[in-house]
UniProtKB/Swiss-Prot annotation:
The chain crosses the membrane at residues 7-29, 32-52, 67-87, 93-113, 121-141, 146-166, 187-207, 211-231, 250-270, 271-291. This is UDP-N-acetylglucosamine transporter TMEM241. The lineage of its organism: Eukaryota, Metazoa, Chordata, Craniata, Vertebrata. It is found in: Golgi apparatus, cis-Golgi network membrane. It comes from the Eukaryota. Golgi-localized UDP-N-acetylglucosamine (UDP-GlcNAc) transporter that transports UDP-N-acetylglucosamine into Golgi lumen. Contributes to lysosomal targeting of NPC2, a key protein required for lysosomal cholesterol exiting, and that utilizes the mannose-6-phosphate (M6P) modification pathway for its lysosomal targeting.
Amino acid sequence: MCVRRSLVGLTFCTCYLASYLTNKYVLSVLKFTYPTLFQGWQTLIGGLLLHVSWKLGWVEINSSSRSHVLVWLPASVLFVGIIYAGSRALSRLAIPVFLTLHNVAEVIICGYQKCFQKEKTSPAKICSALLLLAAAGCLPFNDSQFNPDGYFWAIIHLLCVGAYKILQKSQKPSALSDIDQQYLNYIFSVVLLAFASHPTGDLFSVLDFPFLYFYRFHGSCCASGFLGFFLMFSTVKLKNLLAPGQCAAWIFFAKIITAGLSILLFDAILTSATTGCLLLGALGEALLVFSERKSS
Protein backbone atom coordinates (compact mmCIF):
# COMPACT_ATOMS: atom_id res chain seq x y z
CA MET A 1 0.00 0.00 0.00
CA CYS A 2 2.90 2.34 0.85
CA VAL A 3 4.52 1.66 -2.54
CA ARG A 4 1.22 2.36 -4.31
CA ARG A 5 0.83 5.69 -2.51
CA SER A 6 4.37 6.68 -3.41
CA LEU A 7 3.79 5.79 -7.07
CA VAL A 8 0.58 7.84 -7.15
CA GLY A 9 2.41 10.76 -5.51
CA LEU A 10 5.33 10.58 -7.96
CA THR A 11 2.94 10.30 -10.91
CA PHE A 12 1.11 13.39 -9.69
CA CYS A 13 4.38 15.34 -9.33
CA THR A 14 5.49 14.31 -12.83
CA CYS A 15 2.16 15.36 -14.37
CA TYR A 16 2.16 18.62 -12.40
CA LEU A 17 5.68 19.50 -13.52
CA ALA A 18 5.17 18.52 -17.16
CA SER A 19 1.79 20.27 -17.39
CA TYR A 20 3.05 23.59 -16.01
CA LEU A 21 6.22 23.60 -18.10
CA THR A 22 4.33 22.73 -21.28
CA ASN A 23 1.69 25.39 -20.68
CA LYS A 24 4.38 27.97 -19.92
CA TYR A 25 6.20 27.07 -23.13
CA VAL A 26 3.06 27.50 -25.23
CA LEU A 27 1.99 30.71 -23.49
CA SER A 28 5.31 32.52 -23.01
CA VAL A 29 7.78 31.11 -25.53
CA LEU A 30 5.44 30.49 -28.47
CA LYS A 31 3.23 33.33 -27.18
CA PHE A 32 -0.06 31.60 -27.98
CA THR A 33 -2.11 34.08 -25.94
CA TYR A 34 -5.62 33.12 -27.02
CA PRO A 35 -7.04 31.71 -23.77
CA THR A 36 -10.54 30.87 -25.01
CA LEU A 37 -9.01 28.66 -27.71
CA PHE A 38 -6.14 27.23 -25.64
CA GLN A 39 -8.28 26.40 -22.60
CA GLY A 40 -11.17 25.33 -24.82
CA TRP A 41 -8.82 22.87 -26.52
CA GLN A 42 -7.51 21.53 -23.20
CA THR A 43 -10.99 21.04 -21.74
CA LEU A 44 -12.21 19.43 -24.98
CA ILE A 45 -9.36 16.90 -24.89
CA GLY A 46 -9.91 16.34 -21.16
CA GLY A 47 -13.64 15.81 -21.64
CA LEU A 48 -13.14 13.40 -24.55
CA LEU A 49 -10.52 11.37 -22.68
CA LEU A 50 -12.73 11.22 -19.58
CA HIS A 51 -15.71 10.13 -21.69
CA VAL A 52 -13.65 7.40 -23.39
CA SER A 53 -12.33 6.25 -19.99
CA TRP A 54 -15.92 6.02 -18.75
CA LYS A 55 -17.05 4.00 -21.78
CA LEU A 56 -14.11 1.63 -21.35
CA GLY A 57 -15.00 1.15 -17.68
CA TRP A 58 -11.82 2.73 -16.32
CA VAL A 59 -13.72 5.39 -14.36
CA GLU A 60 -17.27 5.61 -13.06
CA ILE A 61 -19.45 8.57 -13.98
CA ASN A 62 -22.91 8.61 -12.42
CA SER A 63 -25.97 9.78 -14.32
CA SER A 64 -26.69 12.99 -12.44
CA SER A 65 -30.17 14.44 -12.08
CA ARG A 66 -30.91 17.90 -13.43
CA SER A 67 -31.08 19.32 -9.90
CA HIS A 68 -27.56 18.07 -9.09
CA VAL A 69 -26.23 19.57 -12.31
CA LEU A 70 -27.89 22.93 -11.61
CA VAL A 71 -26.50 22.98 -8.06
CA TRP A 72 -23.00 22.41 -9.46
CA LEU A 73 -23.38 25.01 -12.23
CA PRO A 74 -21.93 27.97 -10.20
CA ALA A 75 -18.82 25.88 -9.50
CA SER A 76 -18.43 25.18 -13.23
CA VAL A 77 -18.63 28.92 -13.92
CA LEU A 78 -15.85 29.46 -11.37
CA PHE A 79 -13.83 26.66 -12.99
CA VAL A 80 -13.93 28.54 -16.30
CA GLY A 81 -12.76 31.65 -14.43
CA ILE A 82 -9.89 29.66 -12.89
CA ILE A 83 -8.53 28.31 -16.17
CA TYR A 84 -9.14 31.47 -18.21
CA ALA A 85 -7.58 33.88 -15.69
CA GLY A 86 -4.84 31.37 -14.89
CA SER A 87 -3.88 31.14 -18.56
CA ARG A 88 -3.70 34.92 -18.90
CA ALA A 89 -1.66 35.27 -15.70
CA LEU A 90 0.78 32.44 -16.49
CA SER A 91 1.53 33.94 -19.91
CA ARG A 92 2.82 37.10 -18.19
CA LEU A 93 4.30 35.89 -14.88
CA ALA A 94 7.14 33.57 -13.93
CA ILE A 95 5.93 30.22 -12.59
CA PRO A 96 7.29 30.77 -9.02
CA VAL A 97 5.51 34.15 -8.86
CA PHE A 98 2.29 32.66 -10.23
CA LEU A 99 2.34 29.80 -7.70
CA THR A 100 3.01 32.19 -4.80
CA LEU A 101 -0.01 34.29 -5.78
CA HIS A 102 -2.09 31.15 -6.40
CA ASN A 103 -1.48 30.05 -2.79
CA VAL A 104 -3.38 33.09 -1.47
CA ALA A 105 -6.54 31.12 -2.30
CA GLU A 106 -5.79 29.16 0.89
CA VAL A 107 -5.98 32.42 2.85
CA ILE A 108 -9.47 33.05 1.44
CA ILE A 109 -10.58 29.54 2.45
CA CYS A 110 -9.05 29.90 5.92
CA GLY A 111 -10.72 33.29 6.42
CA TYR A 112 -14.10 31.95 5.29
CA GLN A 113 -13.89 28.97 7.65
CA LYS A 114 -12.85 31.20 10.55
CA CYS A 115 -15.35 34.04 10.02
CA PHE A 116 -18.43 32.34 8.58
CA GLN A 117 -18.24 28.71 9.65
CA LYS A 118 -16.69 29.51 13.05
CA GLU A 119 -14.23 26.63 12.71
CA LYS A 120 -11.38 26.35 15.18
CA THR A 121 -8.17 27.35 13.42
CA SER A 122 -4.77 26.21 14.68
CA PRO A 123 -2.04 28.81 15.35
CA ALA A 124 0.12 27.14 12.67
CA LYS A 125 -2.61 27.62 10.07
CA ILE A 126 -3.10 31.28 11.04
CA CYS A 127 0.67 31.90 10.79
CA SER A 128 0.66 30.11 7.44
CA ALA A 129 -2.12 32.36 6.11
CA LEU A 130 -0.31 35.49 7.29
CA LEU A 131 2.97 34.41 5.66
CA LEU A 132 1.25 33.55 2.37
CA LEU A 133 -0.53 36.90 2.38
CA ALA A 134 2.67 38.79 3.24
CA ALA A 135 4.63 37.03 0.48
CA ALA A 136 1.99 37.79 -2.15
CA GLY A 137 1.56 41.36 -0.92
CA CYS A 138 5.28 42.14 -1.11
CA LEU A 139 5.85 40.53 -4.51
CA PRO A 140 4.48 43.35 -6.73
CA PHE A 141 6.84 45.84 -5.06
CA ASN A 142 9.90 43.60 -5.46
CA ASP A 143 9.29 41.87 -8.78
CA SER A 144 11.79 43.15 -11.36
CA GLN A 145 9.58 41.68 -14.12
CA PHE A 146 6.40 43.25 -12.74
CA ASN A 147 3.51 43.02 -15.17
CA PRO A 148 0.26 44.77 -14.10
CA ASP A 149 -1.94 42.63 -16.34
CA GLY A 150 -0.31 39.46 -15.06
CA TYR A 151 -0.98 40.39 -11.45
CA PHE A 152 -4.54 41.47 -12.26
CA TRP A 153 -5.37 38.12 -13.82
CA ALA A 154 -3.57 36.27 -11.03
CA ILE A 155 -5.87 38.00 -8.51
CA ILE A 156 -8.95 37.00 -10.53
CA HIS A 157 -7.53 33.46 -10.69
CA LEU A 158 -6.93 33.12 -6.95
CA LEU A 159 -10.36 34.57 -6.10
CA CYS A 160 -11.99 32.00 -8.38
CA VAL A 161 -9.88 29.18 -6.88
CA GLY A 162 -10.84 30.22 -3.34
CA ALA A 163 -14.55 30.51 -4.18
CA TYR A 164 -14.48 27.19 -6.07
CA LYS A 165 -12.95 25.29 -3.15
CA ILE A 166 -15.36 26.89 -0.67
CA LEU A 167 -18.31 25.93 -2.87
CA GLN A 168 -16.91 22.42 -3.31
CA LYS A 169 -16.51 21.92 0.44
CA SER A 170 -19.94 23.40 1.22
CA GLN A 171 -21.58 20.71 -0.94
CA LYS A 172 -19.98 17.81 0.93
CA PRO A 173 -21.32 15.17 1.09
CA SER A 174 -22.32 15.61 -2.53
CA ALA A 175 -24.20 13.33 -4.90
CA LEU A 176 -21.46 14.14 -7.41
CA SER A 177 -18.07 12.46 -7.14
CA ASP A 178 -14.85 14.31 -8.00
CA ILE A 179 -14.92 12.70 -11.46
CA ASP A 180 -18.57 13.69 -11.96
CA GLN A 181 -17.74 17.28 -11.03
CA GLN A 182 -14.81 17.41 -13.42
CA TYR A 183 -16.86 15.90 -16.24
CA LEU A 184 -19.47 18.65 -15.83
CA ASN A 185 -16.68 21.26 -15.63
CA TYR A 186 -15.25 20.04 -18.93
CA ILE A 187 -18.61 20.08 -20.73
CA PHE A 188 -19.55 23.55 -19.46
CA SER A 189 -16.07 24.96 -20.19
CA VAL A 190 -16.00 23.71 -23.79
CA VAL A 191 -19.42 25.23 -24.52
CA LEU A 192 -18.78 28.57 -22.77
CA LEU A 193 -15.27 29.07 -24.16
CA ALA A 194 -16.42 28.18 -27.68
CA PHE A 195 -19.08 30.88 -27.52
CA ALA A 196 -16.64 33.36 -25.92
CA SER A 197 -13.96 32.90 -28.60
CA HIS A 198 -15.77 35.20 -31.05
CA PRO A 199 -16.59 38.23 -28.83
CA THR A 200 -13.08 38.13 -27.30
CA GLY A 201 -11.56 38.26 -30.79
CA ASP A 202 -9.52 35.08 -30.31
CA LEU A 203 -11.33 33.19 -33.09
CA PHE A 204 -10.01 35.43 -35.87
CA SER A 205 -6.86 36.81 -34.20
CA VAL A 206 -5.40 33.31 -34.06
CA LEU A 207 -5.10 33.35 -37.87
CA ASP A 208 -2.21 35.81 -37.43
CA PHE A 209 -0.36 33.52 -35.00
CA PRO A 210 3.12 32.99 -36.56
CA PHE A 211 3.53 29.34 -35.45
CA LEU A 212 0.03 28.20 -36.42
CA TYR A 213 1.31 25.63 -38.93
CA PHE A 214 4.46 24.58 -37.06
CA TYR A 215 4.78 21.04 -35.70
CA ARG A 216 6.26 22.18 -32.40
CA PHE A 217 3.12 24.23 -31.76
CA HIS A 218 0.85 21.31 -32.68
CA GLY A 219 2.90 18.93 -30.53
CA SER A 220 2.94 21.29 -27.55
CA CYS A 221 -0.83 21.85 -27.73
CA CYS A 222 -1.51 18.10 -27.94
CA ALA A 223 0.83 17.49 -25.01
CA SER A 224 -0.87 20.22 -22.94
CA GLY A 225 -4.30 18.65 -23.51
CA PHE A 226 -3.21 15.14 -22.52
CA LEU A 227 -1.09 16.33 -19.59
CA GLY A 228 -3.98 18.41 -18.25
CA PHE A 229 -6.17 15.31 -18.22
CA PHE A 230 -3.51 13.15 -16.56
CA LEU A 231 -2.91 15.87 -13.95
CA MET A 232 -6.63 15.99 -13.15
CA PHE A 233 -6.85 12.20 -12.95
CA SER A 234 -3.73 11.83 -10.78
CA THR A 235 -5.00 14.61 -8.48
CA VAL A 236 -8.30 12.76 -7.94
CA LYS A 237 -6.40 9.52 -7.24
CA LEU A 238 -4.08 11.33 -4.83
CA LYS A 239 -6.97 12.84 -2.86
CA ASN A 240 -8.88 9.56 -2.72
CA LEU A 241 -5.91 7.46 -1.66
CA LEU A 242 -4.06 9.72 0.80
CA ALA A 243 -4.97 11.65 3.93
CA PRO A 244 -5.34 15.45 3.48
CA GLY A 245 -1.98 16.10 5.17
CA GLN A 246 -0.10 13.65 2.94
CA CYS A 247 -1.87 15.01 -0.13
CA ALA A 248 -0.88 18.58 0.79
CA ALA A 249 2.74 17.45 1.23
CA TRP A 250 2.87 15.96 -2.29
CA ILE A 251 1.31 19.10 -3.79
CA PHE A 252 3.88 21.26 -1.98
CA PHE A 253 6.70 19.02 -3.23
CA ALA A 254 5.39 19.27 -6.80
CA LYS A 255 5.23 23.06 -6.59
CA ILE A 256 8.80 23.32 -5.28
CA ILE A 257 10.18 21.13 -8.09
CA THR A 258 8.16 22.96 -10.74
CA ALA A 259 9.16 26.41 -9.50
CA GLY A 260 12.84 25.42 -9.25
CA LEU A 261 13.08 23.86 -12.71
CA SER A 262 11.12 26.68 -14.35
CA ILE A 263 13.78 29.17 -13.23
CA LEU A 264 16.39 27.15 -15.14
CA LEU A 265 14.28 26.64 -18.27
CA PHE A 266 12.60 30.04 -18.71
CA ASP A 267 13.77 33.64 -18.51
CA ALA A 268 13.26 34.66 -14.90
CA ILE A 269 15.07 37.54 -13.20
CA LEU A 270 15.13 36.91 -9.46
CA THR A 271 16.53 39.65 -7.25
CA SER A 272 17.32 38.99 -3.59
CA ALA A 273 14.07 40.75 -2.62
CA THR A 274 12.00 38.64 -5.03
CA THR A 275 13.70 35.47 -3.81
CA GLY A 276 12.92 36.49 -0.22
CA CYS A 277 9.22 36.86 -1.08
CA LEU A 278 9.16 33.46 -2.79
CA LEU A 279 10.90 31.78 0.16
CA LEU A 280 8.45 33.45 2.54
CA GLY A 281 5.59 32.01 0.48
CA ALA A 282 7.23 28.57 0.53
CA LEU A 283 7.59 28.77 4.31
CA GLY A 284 3.91 29.71 4.57
CA GLU A 285 2.86 26.71 2.51
CA ALA A 286 5.18 24.41 4.48
CA LEU A 287 3.42 25.57 7.66
CA LEU A 288 0.07 24.88 5.99
CA VAL A 289 1.20 21.33 5.19
CA PHE A 290 2.35 20.91 8.80
CA SER A 291 -1.03 22.06 10.13
CA GLU A 292 -2.88 19.75 7.71
CA ARG A 293 -0.77 16.74 8.73
CA LYS A 294 -1.25 17.55 12.41
CA SER A 295 -5.04 17.80 12.10
CA SER A 296 -5.49 14.70 9.90
